[in-house]
Curated annotation (Swiss-Prot):
GO terms, biological process: L-histidine biosynthetic process
InterPro entries noted in UniProt: Class_I_gatase-like, GATASE, Imidazole-glycPsynth_HisH
Record's protein name: Imidazole glycerol phosphate synthase subunit HisH 2
Main location: cytoplasm
Reactions the enzyme catalyzes: 5-[(5-phospho-1-deoxy-D-ribulos-1-ylimino)methylamino]-1-(5-phospho-beta-D-ribosyl)imidazole-4-carboxamide + L-glutamine = D-erythro-1-(imidazol-4-yl)glycerol 3-phosphate + 5-amino-1-(5-phospho-beta-D-ribosyl)imidazole-4-carboxamide + L-glutamate + H(+); L-glutamine + H2O = L-glutamate + NH4(+)
Function (record text): IGPS catalyzes the conversion of PRFAR and glutamine to IGP, AICAR and glutamate. The HisH subunit provides the glutamine amidotransferase activity that produces the ammonia necessary to HisF for the synthesis of IGP and AICAR.
EC nos: 4.3.2.10, 3.5.1.2
GO molecular function, one term: glutaminase activity
Keywords, alphabetical: Amino-acid biosynthesis, Cytoplasm, Glutamine amidotransferase, Histidine biosynthesis, Hydrolase, Lyase
GO CC field: cytoplasm
Catalytic residues of the enzyme: C82 (nucleophile), H192, E194
Length: 212
């Protein structure tokens, strides 16, 4: 059984993620700091809201350094969800009105950019179910059928990766949308696995059994 630290930085909704972890038969511990992370086998970084606000909360609580110790030094598997995935990037242009991009955690060589679908009839945010195309194999997708790769999205920004090898899956919404990224012991999903019914639970279960 995995012991999962779910990071709560004050503006993210952790309840549905906790329920999904427990549904998969694992122990979930909601943590605001180093307590919980040090004893965890896996870490989940959920996220809703604005990039800049989230990063301020994370830095104010010292969670950026705590994550670096747990993920980069101790090698614990990290799953970052929705805004959480975007926070892995180097920068984001969200609400960067003065031209200065917000700085992220920098765990993935990527920048976050506003969705600009070519079809003007497509509304922003991208909200609802969408299929993803698997670009390469990864343990979080093991034994998942191509017909079971539909997930629930809610977002207005998306990650643009410098290294295409970091991209595991893409969706299409008037443009290519990075849906899953992975590097070493880090994985991020732009969609919400905890809200994606059977496909999301299967992916979550794969993550919780992953020991990179």
């Amino acid at each position: 059984m995995a012991r999962v630290a779910i990071i709560d930085y004050g503006i993210n909704n952790v309840r549905s993620v906790r329920n999904a972890v427990e549904y998969c038969g694992h122990e979930a511990v909601v943590t605001h700091g180093n307590d919980g992370i040090a004893d965890a086998s896996h870490i989940i970084l959920p996220g809703v809201g604005a990039f800049g606000d989230a990063m301020k909360k994370i830095r104010d609580r010292g969670l950026d350094e705590i994550l670096a110790r747990g993920v980069c030094e101790a090698g614990k598997p990290l799953l970052a969800v929705c805004l959480g995935m975007q926070l892995l990037a180097k920068t984001s242009e969200e609400h960067a009105d003065d031209g200065e991009f917000f700085q992220g955690l920098g765990l993935i060589e990527a920048d976050v950019r506003r969705l600009r679908p070519k079809d003007p009839d497509l509304k922003i945010p991208h909200m609802g179910w969408n299929n993803i195309t698997k670009l390469r194999e990864h343990p979080i997708l093991v034994n998942m059928r191509e017909t079971n790769l539909a997930f629930y999205f809610v977002h207005s920004f998306a990650m643009s990766c410098e290294n295409e090898d970091d991209v595991v899956g893409r969706a299409t919404y008037g443009q290519d949308v990075t849906a899953i990224v992975a590097r070493d012991n880090i994985v991020g999903t732009q969609f919400h696995p905890e809200k994606s019914q059977d496909s999301g639970i299967e992916l979550m279960s794969n993550f919780l059994q992953w020991n990179p």
